[in-house]
């Protein structure tokens, strides 16, 4: 059964293999924070000035919040509209002349004789009327005149049941009228209108209408529905509704509101003082133009006024009152970049004073360490940049302390301890306090490491001066992306005098007119070979190019004329004015101290130090505003020699003695350089010249005196190697620059596709 399936499975297996061979590795997915997207294109890549960063921190200090209103408290268009009319008097057809007539006679003349309407007069309606209309009046005007004279006599005309009922004013509502939302022009006698309000409350509208309305004209208010009910004749209702339209406006949009934080003193007390001067009870022209409310939780004063420009004047008064306050308060400032303890020390240097507590030492960011680059003090490199050696005093970076260590622990970043572990420095107390002298006053400043916050107890005036200094110091430091290529070049042929000599002297002008070919390379002496210089090597026909921003071209050019071996190609980010250490090699134990107490056979004690060997590069960049990068560089290539033969014995006393220490062949350069952003500098001249003697020949015969040379020969090989260092610093001013570098490396990884073996 299996033999029959085998031919069928073979094509399937072959197809799967072909598909797997054609598959490619998907490109890496780089995820980013969308908040890092540039908002203004290329402007996002520019360096932020100290002034701009200070403005960005302005939100940290309490600033007034002002909303300026329109200043419009009434409906201007409604107030300017003309009053409604009933038509011209010339359109009328009747004239009246009443001299002390009774109300009943006037009602009969207008309603009965002129308009022909049914009417009923209640017994309680009494009064006399004097009325004359030399010009003819219309029926609508006559009805309006009747409503007016009835109102003067405390009577109302209510249309109900197809007739007009003339009743006393206090009986006009009960059981005779119902609320309506119709237009006042449709009113026939005394009616009631329900008016919904948009912005103003019903109770406030009642206060506004009371001076203009007849007694009992405001029937009622409903706060839950925010409506007001009005009663009156057509003319009265038109006036009432027009008044409502004038005052029912967006009051909040017209009012100006300001919230002013108080630095010294209490908001409640300051608000009460302002109320006495500008409030409703004050005897000033601006009385009632302001409303002051203390906000105790925020220690601020809320100011409301219908005039926007008044807020500026109130702010000036508040600033004067706040500045004049001599009270001492506790201020806090949460720092973003610099350590609180270090900033407290800087403030002590600026304003003068003294401090106590915590550990001193400058640092640009929380957790950062500032050290010094230096040479050895005892011939060995001991890196104390991160951590310290037990029992030893800390030395400079690139230097060695003279102390000893039983454990052999080193604090080198990227290195290892004697037990093979990288150790962080112990957590130290970074809290501290200083006392400043600001404008003759003592100011207490406390640094809280847990929240990286400064606590300052002082007056508001002194706090302003201290805060200005804090905002200038608490800025984001720039970073530098350093690409280095460390190579070892074999000095043979044209390179026998060194790499630098080769570029300066062995490169001459080409013979061809077009600048290509010729027996020699184009001259680079005096031209700055790190600019755009190109030519060709005629010995093997390989072209080469030097570019100021392309260190790989230099490596490629040297690789064509000699043997070249890359020792290290690190790429690292480092903060401005901080140190980057790269170490690839071995740690060699060195017996520094041996003590024999003489108290028995096993009474010898030794102290061992571990020395870093291999390729060690230490760089500290310092960036200027114009894009120049100053570099402090220490480069070392060290190789341990062979251990003495006597140390291979089993004797413990011999192996552990200082005589068993190996020699370390070291090539080191320490320099300071200045380079433009993105350009490459080369360090050369670390030449190692070694000679190896050897002999071979016929055994025994080649060792005979005098004639032994006839049966053998002696050899002597000279080996010259030079270490060159190419360093390219690139300034990273903001997160967008860091993203661009990530994209560049990501594109390089994407281009590394698997090889297609089927082609």
Swiss-Prot record:
The cellular location(s) given in this protein's UniProt record come to: Cell outer membrane
Secretin: annotated span: 479-734
* Residue positions bearing lipid (S-diacylglycerol cysteine): 22
- The ranges of region (Disordered) come to 40-69, 352-434
Main localization is: membrane
> In the record, which residues are listed under signal peptide?
1-21
- Alphabetically list the UniProt keywords: Cell outer membrane, Lipoprotein, Membrane, Palmitate, Protein transport, Signal, Transmembrane, Transmembrane beta strand, Transport
Chain segments carrying region N1: 189-253
Spell out the residue ranges making up region: N3.
326-474
Provide ranges: composition bias, Low complexity: 40-51
Query: What are the recorded Gene Ontology BP terms?
Result: protein secretion; protein secretion by the type II secretion system
- What Gene Ontology cellular component terms go with this record? cell outer membrane; type II protein secretion system complex
User: According to the UniProt record, where is the region S domain?
Assistant: 736-759
Q: How does it assemble?
A: Forms a cylindrical channel with 15 subunits. Binds to XpsN.
Q: What is known of its domains?
A: The N0, N1, N2 and N3 domains are periplasmic, while the secretin and S domains form a channel that is partially inserted in the outer membrane. The N1, N2 and N3 domains each form a periplasmic ring. The secretin domain forms a double beta-barrel structure; the outer barrel has a diameter of about 110 Angstroms while the inner barrel forms the central gate with a small pore in the closed state.
Into which family does the record put it? Answer: Belongs to the bacterial secretin family. GSP D subfamily.
User: This protein is called what?
Assistant: Secretin XpsD
Native source organism of the sequence: Xanthomonas campestris pv. campestris (strain ATCC 33913 / DSM 3586 / NCPPB 528 / LMG 568 / P 25)
The organism's lineage is:
Bacteria, Pseudomonadati, Pseudomonadota, Gammaproteobacteria, Lysobacterales
